From Swiss-Prot:
A Pfam family annotated for this UniProt entry: RNA_pol_Rpb1_4
Subunit structure: The RNAP catalytic core consists of 2 alpha, 1 beta, 1 beta' and 1 omega subunit. When a sigma factor is associated with the core the holoenzyme is formed, which can initiate transcription.
Described purpose of this protein according to its UniProt entry: DNA-dependent RNA polymerase catalyzes the transcription of DNA into RNA using the four ribonucleoside triphosphates as substrates.
The encoding gene: rpoC
Catalytic reaction list: RNA(n) + a ribonucleoside 5'-triphosphate = RNA(n+1) + diphosphate
GO cellular component: DNA-directed RNA polymerase complex
Positions annotated to bind Mg(2+): D462, D464, D466
Binding site for Zn(2+) 1: C72, C74, C87, C90
Organism this protein belongs to: Aromatoleum aromaticum (strain DSM 19018 / LMG 30748 / EbN1)
GO biological process, one term: DNA-templated transcription
Gene Ontology molecular function: any one: DNA binding
Claim: Magnesium is one of the keywords in the record: yes
Record's protein name: DNA-directed RNA polymerase subunit beta'
Amino acids binding Zn(2+) 2: C816, C890, C897, C900
Length: 1409
């Protein structure tokens, strides 16, 4: 009996943990037969009367096993004792019926058929191996042509196609000297006779000799496929099926419905069709039927096998009775509903429930209210266990009964079971890791789950009918992880930006704001109190108002660095509300943090300060108390919304009238032809935009201030206590823009296509809209809803792609030892500090010692984490750049190292080994996606106003420094004219810290000197915003060349002034003959001797070429001096580009798509000159210092940023336009690329006020750069132009260099996130992402091996993920596979390594248990 049980146990528990990798390959016919338990010969399924499977049919019990456990089909052998007996009557083995899920069968095909995946999945693998086109192969396979398999002694070629007539003619001519076949036999013959080794040698030879790029590409592709066959030992002819495997019947079930009908899987229909045709073909072959009939049958067989494998891939899809295409094997695994995404990655789990959520303000932060009935159901097994342990029930059945009848003792046991047993709450959509958090359940009556108000922000939950799911962690380890890692009170910070996410919102903010506001001349003003208690009594007895400024003694607790506490009592002059609030301050925070009106931002800062100074525990308690206080006071305040609160500004009518007059004036100008219709529209939109702003300002001034009489009887203004104003001002709800619609004017509205309607809505909701205004309003409202729906889908898809590209990036070691990093500076744009240095380096590890600039001593050592204190120190020393380690420079091969990542933002300390930083980065970028806009902005009206700046002034006092590559010349008037393309001027403070930075355009006039002190508000430089000058750097006499009126230039006469100017015209508009083709007007300069002036240090003449549209301002023979303007280019030519904004822009950046009109970067460093123009293109030549010249053709309509004789650096912009990230990587390197992508992505998020830490974007960029292209293979196994994982190349190079051979040379390549996900080494991960068929086809041919490195692959094979606490499991598993046995103590030590903050009580339980 014992051995029997042991056997049974073995049968149910196969040791699935023994494998380390999964390989995929093609199965040979013998392999398929070896899997099979018998051949399916008949298309029958189940006998409709007896419901028993037909013999030799698709559900045959003899092949697949018994239908009932331990019972043969005819019923002769029943029960366990006959285990393993094969019944002699019906031939069925007596065993478990679940073998019907795993036993396969096969069908012997009468004629070989091609596997459609290898035929049709582009590029066709069959075509590649045979070097034939897909069209040709199809003609052979579907019996339209013969193919020569063995030419013998004839002049025919192997693989040549012959039509029917050709074939008959050749047979006449050569008899049977040659073999030509049709259908899959022909292709199989070709594949069998293919000598892979020989072909590879031939191809390598061809690759050496050929020069054409296209051929190299074609050959290397084919070479790759053939080498894959060679390495994997897979024979090419296995792509042709001779035996078809049959899926186990329980995976394609047939279920009898009532009424004699059956519900069946589509696969059964597809198999039936194959079997029918196969049997018919066998019979025809036996009968020696005419060739044409056999051929037709073979073609039909090929088609039916095609649709079984991948229906609809070729021709029309096979349909069932209801005209719906049948679901083939390929459809089973691909797409959202396929095996990968539906069953392997997203399983449904037991011990879970869902219900509506309601607010639970009485809960502590780590609690949630769980309905009793739900808890009873969820914790059933625990209750059964307890009932048995206590001896209240002897069997499970009895326990079940007790629970179902809900006996009183059950409730007591439930209380006990639930104590200290966390449950996990999840709200869909789970966009980041805070969408699932653990709570300790508190039993409540009713049927709704109660949720703590402060976690609503993280869940993005509200109580308008949202539902949440509850999950119960079962094992002790799971409970411990839930408690230490997921408990709501352990997740105070947001992993996206390291700021608190447990922040009060809505009513709480309103209550706290109301409590901390100050009022003039309110009850009890000026009173003095000995302590808060006394003040409270005065308040309760109505002698004192919350807003009164009083004098009161407050107790503060000071905490020293060593943790000693001392109380200190100080007298403060503050408001009553703030004094009451001071009672709940955590020890260690001074009262000054509270002594202001608390708006939402302030409260967030307050919680942040508490977390940094007082630690997690105090902060959680503090947040809870803040919440209670806020709710209480919001109730007390009784703030409501009343019609009277919406004050319409008094000046509104005047402002609107003035705007109407302006619009009339512009309409008059338009009718008299002074402005075009476009200009008129833009101006009108502009005027109304301004008017709306003025009305809004007047309204806010009126709402925000009110007149009151103070104690001394004077009238003073105070901040208003208007309900609506308070709601917006505190940040509780609403915004200035919404109040503006309520009480100002609604302003301009957009049509559905995004264009702005020029007649605004001048009324507001308070006054009411008329029919037309209401109708116009509906446009915008409806578009908003449509936009939101679109946005959600798009944002979700972006997140999915991001997660997929980064899912295997985990912190795998503590320090990779690199000294590399990026130099971080404050981000300054348009003279304003957008992001100070402290925000950019906080939580990073510095790569070099930070040195005090004055004393030159090291203040922070390289390799130390820059926390708040370190950053404060750096700021105080006036250091304006720090080199920090980044994810992009990390040298860890697989994964990242902790030092290069820095601080784990969600925990506030150095990141742990095992943290899945890739997924966190993806979530942090994807989660705010729904807040981004979807539309592209057309620059016009309002947006273009800002563009026409004509100068910069300093915003702060300091010292001027020139930055960038500032070059300037002084002209005759002594003005400094800038002749550099990327000049910048910086204003630094006394400490030398950069305060502002401004970009200056070419041709601007500098008004300050380098190193000069300036005050705030001083003009630094001016320029004409509407034209771009061309300035001469040399003096001399102007000599025109190719300046012919009517040929290259035209005379323009200004109607108003009557002056004439020469305008350079395009060759197409030229009037004279062909002589002037390709000639461009230019100016040369002559010196006193009449010789051409040379460029300094060379023997090239100075020649300034004018581009089309330039206005030449000098005359022939005129004397010019340095810095004079030769020509002006009107700036209308820079067309207003549509700016892609919001979500599409982020997707575009991460997909690394080259922009439409990309700018051109200089490929080399050298001097620019212009060659002869060809049709429609201008020729730009860059001559390097050693004299090598490189030509570039640039379309005429493009705006060239450089001029003749200018020196450009490699990677500098020479043709205007948005940058192409691939060019940046190639010419400027990784750092420049990272900067570009980070800045661009951050710009989009910053516009919406979303904060994301740079390191998340760096992590994504690292994954986009993880592949390289081989330039020169050296002695490695790679092929030139091949794309490989960087880590793979490095490993291979290490191996080769160790043998003293030549390593492979490679260059970085940037892949978009979709491409990067699909080209990952793990085929399982790629297949579960997108294009499943293609990925699997490719992997099968190459015999790929998946080492199960990433998170996704491990989820799919059903293991713990190799991140976090799962890392220990994987390490142990590997050790055990290597034969070491590790005890439980070891596992415990590992666990503590990964989960640092395990509470003591838990650890005792675990060690005891």
């Amino acid at each position: 009996m014992k051995s029997l049980l042991a056997d049974l146990f073995k049968q149910t528990l196969p040791n699935e943990d023994q494998f380390d990798a999964i390989t995929i390959g093609l199965a040979s016919p013998d392999k398929i037969r070896s899997w099979s338990y018998g051949e399916v010969k008949k298309p029958e399924t189940i006998n409709y009367r007896t419901f028993k499977p037909e013999r030799d049919g698709l559900f045959c019990a003899k092949i697949f096993g018994p239908v009932k456990d331990y019972e043969c089909l005819c019923g002769k052998y029943k029960r366990l004792k006959h285990r393993g007996v094969i019944c002699e009557k019906c031939g069925v083995e007596v065993t478990l019926s679940k073998v019907r899920r795993e036993r396969m069968a096969h069908i012997e095909l009468a004629s070989p058929t091609a596997h459609i995946w290898f035929l049709k999945s582009l590029p066709s693998r069959l075509g590649m191996v045979l070097d034939m086109t897909l069209r040709d192969i199809e003609r052979v396979l579907y019996f339209e042509a013969f193919v020569v398999v063995e030419p013998g002694m004839t002049p025919l070629n192997r693989g040549q196609l012959l039509t029917e007539d050709d074939y008959l003619a050749k047979v006449e001519e050569y008899g049977d000297d040659f073999d030509a076949l049709m259908g899959a036999e022909g292709i199989r013959g070709l594949l069998r006779t293919l000598d892979v080794k020989l072909e590879i040698e031939k191809l390598r030879g061809d690759l050496e000799t050929t020069g054409s790029e296209a051929k190299i590409k074609k050959f290397s592709k084919r070479l790759k496929v053939l080498e894959a066959f060679m390495q994997s030992g897979i024979k090419p002819e296995w792509m042709i099926l001779e035996v078809l495997p049959v899926l186990p019947p329980d995976l394609r079930p047939l279920v009898p419905l009532d009424g004699g009908r059956f519900a069946t899987s589509d696969l059964n229909d597809l198999y039936r069709r194959v079997i029918n045709r196969n049997n018919r073909l066998k019979r025809l072959l036996e009968l020696k039927a005419p060739e044409i009939i056999v051929r037709n049958e073979k073609r039909m067989l090929q088609e039916s096998v095609d649709s079984l494998l991948d229906n609809g891939r070729r021709g029309k899809a096979m349909t069932g009775a209801n005209k719906r295409p049948l679901k083939s094997l390929a459809d089973m695994i691909k797409g959202k509903g396929g095996r990968f995404r539906q069953n392997l990655l997203g399983k449904r789990v037991d011990y879970s429930g869902r219900s509506v959520i309601v607010v639970g303000p009485q809960l502590k932060l780590h609690q949630c209210g769980l309905p009793k009935l739900m808890a009873l159901e969820l914790f059933k097994p625990f209750i059964f266990n307890k009932l048995e342990l206590m001896g209240l029930a002897t069997t499970i059945k009895q326990a079940k009964k007790m629970v179902e009848s809900q006996e009183p003792v059950v409730w007591d046991i439930l209380e006990e079971v639930i104590r200290e047993h966390p449950v996990m709450l999840n709200r869909a959509p789970t966009l980041h890791r805070l969408g699932i958090q653990a709570f300790e359940p508190v039993l409540i009556e009713g049927k709704a789950i109660q949720l703590h108000p402060l976690v609503c922000v993280a869940f993005n939950a509200d109580f308008d009918g949202d539902q949440m799911a509850v999950h119960v962690p079962l094992s002790l380890e799971a409970q411990m992880e839930a408690r230490t890692l997921m408990l709501a009170s352990n997740n105070v910070l947001s992993p996206a930006n390291g700021e608190p996410i447990i922040v009060p919102s809505q009513d709480i903010v309103l209550g706290l704001y109301y409590a901390t506001r100050e009022g003039v001349n309110v009850a009890g003003e000026g009173m003095a109190f000995s302590d808060v208690g006394e003040l409270k009594r005065a308040y309760e007895s109505k002698q004192l108002s919350l807003h009164a400024r009083v004098s009161v003694r407050l107790k503060e607790v000071e905490v020293s660095a060593e943790g000693e506490r001392r109380d200190k009592i100080t007298r403060y002059n503050t408001t009553a509300g703030r004094a009451m609030l001071s009672e709940i301050l955590p020890p260690g925070l001074p009262f000054s943090v509270l002594d202001k009106a608390l708006k939402k931002k302030e409260i967030s800062r307050l919680i942040n300060a508490s977390f940094r100074r007082c630690g997690l525990k105090e902060t959680v308690v503090f947040a809870d108390k803040l919440m209670q206080f806020g709710f209480r006071l919001a109730t007390r305040a009784g703030i409501s919304i009343a019609v009277k609160d919406m004050l319409v500004p008094r000046q509104k009518d005047v402002l609107i009238h003035a705007a109407e007059q302006e619009v009339k004036e512009i309409a008059r100008q338009y009718t008299s032809g002074l402005v075009t219709d476009g200009e008129r529209y833009n101006k009108v939109v502009d005027i109304w935009g301004r008017a709306g702003d003025q009305v809004a300002k007047a309204m806010m001034d009126q709402l925000g201030q009110e007149d009151v009489v103070n104690r001394h009887g004077d009238t003073v203004k105070q901040e208003s206590f208007n309900s609506i104003y308070m709601m917006a001002d505190s940040g509780a709800r609403g915004s200035a823009a919404q109040i503006r619609q309520l009480a100002g004017m609604r302003g301009l509205m957009a049509k559905p296509d995004g264009s702005i309607i020029e007649t605004p809505i001048t009324t507001n909701f308070r006054e009411g809209l008329n029919v037309l205004q209401y109708f116009i309003s509906t446009h915008g409202a409806r578009k908003g809803l449509a936009d939101t729906a679109l946005k959600t889908a798009n944002s979700g898809y972006l997140t999915r792609r991001l997660v997929d590209v980064t899912q295997d990036l985990v912190v795998t070691e503590d320090d990779c030892g690199t000294r590399d990093g990026f130099v971080m500076k404050a981000l300054i744009e348009g003279g304003e500090v957008i992001e100070p240095l402290r925000d950019r380096i906080l939580g990073r590890v510095c790569a070099e010692d930070v040195v005090n600039p004055e004393s030159q001593e090291t203040v922070i050592e390289a390799g130390s984490l820059l926390g708040e204190d370190a950053v404060d120190l750096i700021e105080s020393l006036g250091i304006d750049e720090v080199k920090v380690r980044t994810a992009l420079t990390c040298e860890t091969r697989y994964g990242l190292c902790g030092k290069c990542y820095g601080r784990d933002l969600g925990r506030g300390s150095q990141v742990n080994v095992g943290e899945a930083v890739g997924v966190i980065a993806a979530q942090s970028i994807g989660e705010p996606g729904t807040q981004l806009t979807m539309r592209t902005f057309h620059v016009g009206g309002a947006a273009s106003r800002a563009a026409a700046a004509s100068g910069v002034e300093s915003k702060s006092a300091g010292t001027v420094r020139f930055a960038g590559n500032m070059r300037y010349v002084s002209n005759a008037k002594g003005e400094k004219i800038i002749i550099a393309r990327s000049a910048e001027v910086v204003v630094a403070d006394d400490m030398g810290r950069e305060r502002e930075r401004h970009k200056l355009p070419y041709g601007a006039t500098l008004l300050v000197d380098d190193g000069a002190p300036v005050k705030a508000g001083v003009l630094l430089a001016t320029w004409d915003p509407h034209t771009r000058p061309i300035v001469t750097e040399y003096s001399g006499t102007v000599k025109f060349e190719n300046v012919e009126e009517g040929a290259t230039v035209a005379k323009q006469i200004d109607e108003v002034t009557g002056l004439s100017t020469l305008v350079v015209i395009d060759g197409k508009r030229r009037t004279s003959g062909a002589s002037s083709k390709g000639v461009r007007p230019q100016v040369k300069l002559l010196d006193e001797r009449g010789e051409e002036v040379k460029i300094a240090g060379t023997d090239h003449s100075v020649a300034i070429t004018f581009q089309v549209g330039s206005l030449i301002t000098v005359k022939d023979g005129q004397e010019v001096s340095v810095g004079d303007i030769l020509a002006r280019i009107p700036q209308e030519s820079a067309k207003t580009r549509d700016i892609t904004g919001g979500l599409p822009r982020v997707a575009e950046l991460f997909e690394a798509r080259p922009p439409k009109d990309a700018g051109v970067l200089a490929e080399y460093t050298g001097t620019v000159s212009f060659g002869k123009d060809t049709k429609g293109k201008q020729r730009l030549v860059i001559t390097e210092a050693d004299g090598t010249a490189h030509e570039f053709l640039i379309p005429k309509d493009k705006h060239v940023m450089v001029h003749d004789g200018q020196v450009v650096n490699k990677g500098e912009l020479i043709v205007d336009g948005p940058a192409d990230p691939h060019d940046i990587l190639r010419l400027q390197g990784i750092e420049a690329l990272a900067r570009y992508i980070i800045d661009e992505v951050q710009d989009v998020y910053r516009l919406q006020g979303v904060k994301i830490n740079d390191k998340h974007i760096e992590v994504i960029v690292r994954q986009m750069l993880r592949r390289v292209v081989i330039n020169d293979a050296g002695n490695s196994r790679f092929i030139r132009e091949e794309q490989v994982e960087r880590s793979e190349v490095l490993d291979e190079n290490d191996r080769i260099e160790a043998e003293g051979k030549l390593p492979a040379q490679y260059q970085n390549v940037l892949l978009g996130i979709t491409k990067a996900s699909l080209s990952t080494d793990s085929f399982i991960s790629a297949a579960s992402f997108q294009e499943t068929t293609r990925v699997l086809t490719e992997a099968a041919i190459m015999g790929k091996r998946d080492d199960l490195r990433g998170l996704k692959e491990n989820v799919i094979v059903g293991r713990l993920i190799p991140a976090g606490t799962g890392m220990a499991y994987h390490r142990n598993r590997k050790a055990q596979n290597a034969g070491e046995d590790l005890g439980p103590e070891h596992a415990w030590a590992e666990m503590q390594e990964v989960v640092p903050e395990v509470p003591a009580d838990v650890s005792q339980d675990v060690q005891a248990g």
